[in-house]
């Protein structure tokens, strides 16, 4: 039995496929989805969404969003995300530089300015996920 996964963004439909397994970057903890999973709605953190298709993992870098898992005759996963980024191996150095800049920005933010601190924290989290995606592809 497989999992039907659909990914959408605010600009429209992005991707649909049948998967063997899915690893979601849930806001509480990484969430592994297998066929027959219980019904659940979860928030997604910026991170690496991994989809196993034909015994190979496909990494997808996402920003925040939500996922709904519904199981009846089959397991269906609908993922709504704000942004998605294609991972290209030649951009690894750029990803490391962006992470360094995000760390620097977080260190110079006024600790009293909560909005700026949250924004800088999200940028750092996304930059860390980008570097993680490149390392994932290298293995």
UniProtKB/Swiss-Prot annotation:
What SUPFAM superfamilies does UniProt report for this protein, alphabetically? Epsilon subunit of F1F0-ATP synthase N-terminal domain (SSF51344)
Q: Which family does it belong to?
A: Belongs to the ATPase epsilon chain family.
Q: What is this protein called?
A: ATP synthase epsilon chain, chloroplastic
Q: Which gene encodes it?
A: atpE
Transmembrane stretches in the record are none
Q: One of this protein's Pfam families, by short name?
A: ATP-synt_DE_N
Cellular component aspect of the GO annotation: chloroplast thylakoid membrane; proton-transporting ATP synthase complex
Q: Which HAMAP family match?
A: ATP_synth_epsil_bac
As for subcellular location, the record says: Plastid, Chloroplast thylakoid membrane
Q: Which InterPro entries match?
A: ATP_synth_F1_dsu/esu (IPR001469), ATP_synth_F1_dsu/esu_N (IPR020546), ATPsynth_dsu/esu_N (IPR036771)
Function, in words: Produces ATP from ADP in the presence of a proton gradient across the membrane.
Highest taxon in the source lineage: Eukaryota
